[in-house]
């Protein structure tokens, strides 16, 4: 079952200081963490995360399932990134690129890769 939950970004003032940006990320993190189950495997999308091929992501998802993980949560950060508490809670940091993308576009890319992973794991030809 796939469920998409969107948590609104905090408004960021122009020329916000680092302290203000940290406070904003912390507020967003607090809201995000309310949706993350204790037994879930949390994958955060981060520029500094590990880059995987589609096949490697499929293998990661398959391995989690074999290990008995029934809830996998992917988190895409807002325009400022993810707050420290979400990063601490993360089980795995994943990167699709060293570039920055709008989070709405990243959602489409992530959903396509999740779909592709399941097709790969089912031995279907979609990933070619």
Write out the residue ranges for each language-model feature.
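Switch/connector loops and helix/strand junctions flanking conserved nucleotide-binding motifs
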Residues: 13-14, 82-85
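S-adenosyl-L-methionine/SAH cofactor-binding core of RNA-modifying enzymes
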Residues: 3-70
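Structured adenosyl-cofactor binding patch, chiefly the S-adenosyl-L-methionine
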Residues: 84-128
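Conserved nucleotide-binding/hydrolysis micro-motifs of P-loop NTPases
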Residues: 49, 80-82
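Rossmann-fold NAD(P)-binding glycine/threonine-rich loop
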Residues: 77
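Conserved beta-strand segments of alpha/beta enzyme cores
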Residues: 1-3, 92
């Amino acid at each position: 079952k796939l469920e998409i939950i969107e948590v609104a970004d905090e408004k960021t003032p122009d020329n916000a200081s680092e302290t203000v940006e940290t406070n904003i990320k912390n507020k967003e993190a607090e809201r995000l963490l309310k949706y993350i189950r204790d037994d879930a495997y949390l994958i955060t999308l981060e520029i500094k995360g590990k880059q995987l091929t589609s096949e490697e992501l499929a293998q990661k998802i398959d391995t989690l399932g074999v290990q008995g993980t029934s809830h996998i949560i992917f988190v895409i950060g807002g325009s400022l990134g993810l707050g420290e508490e979400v990063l601490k809670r993360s089980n795995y940091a994943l990167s699709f690129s060293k570039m920055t993308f709008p989070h709405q576009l990243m959602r489409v890319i992530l959903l396509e890769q999740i779909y592709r992973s399941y097709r790969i794991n089912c031995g279907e030809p979609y990933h070619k």
